[in-house]
Amino acid sequence: HLGLDAWAGFPGAAPDENAGRPGDDGRFRLGVTHAPYRRVLDAMTADGADLLLAGHTHGGQVCVPFLGALVTNCDLPRRQASGVSTWTAAGRTVPLEVSAGLGTAPSAPVRFACRPEAVVLDLVPRG
């Protein structure tokens, strides 16, 4: 945490002259959000994020075998409720990891066909 968490692109956020500024300086840019709403993923991708990380969906929490998640608790497509996929916005496509997490929603304290997970990502330099 570098004190750059007041992302200027989020509605109602306090402006931060360093946050949300795309660049071509070769630095790796990580976009992290609790809930993967499309507008947030779109804005982070447009702002230059190289990798997007999110949670909130609990992997759908209740899944149907061979069909997948029934809900995502946001506007993310159900097929992206957990795991690695890609997100395309503003002419860019970046990896998206949505963790199913360990817990459940307070309103529905149950999981079915949706294993809890703690994700470990190994990031290696390109090249």
What is the role of each PLM region?
Residues H1-D42, A108-R115:
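Binuclear metal-dependent hydrolase catalytic cores centered on His/Asp/Glu-rich metal-binding motifs
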Residues G3-D5, A100-L102, P125:
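A mature extracytoplasmic/lumenal domain signature
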Residues A19-G26, T88-V94, R126:
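Intrinsically disordered, low-complexity coil segments
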Residues L30, P36-V119:
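Conserved beta-sheet core of the metallophosphoesterase superfamily
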Residues L121-G127:
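Short beta-strand-to-coil "C-cap" segments at the C-terminal boundary of structured domains/repeats
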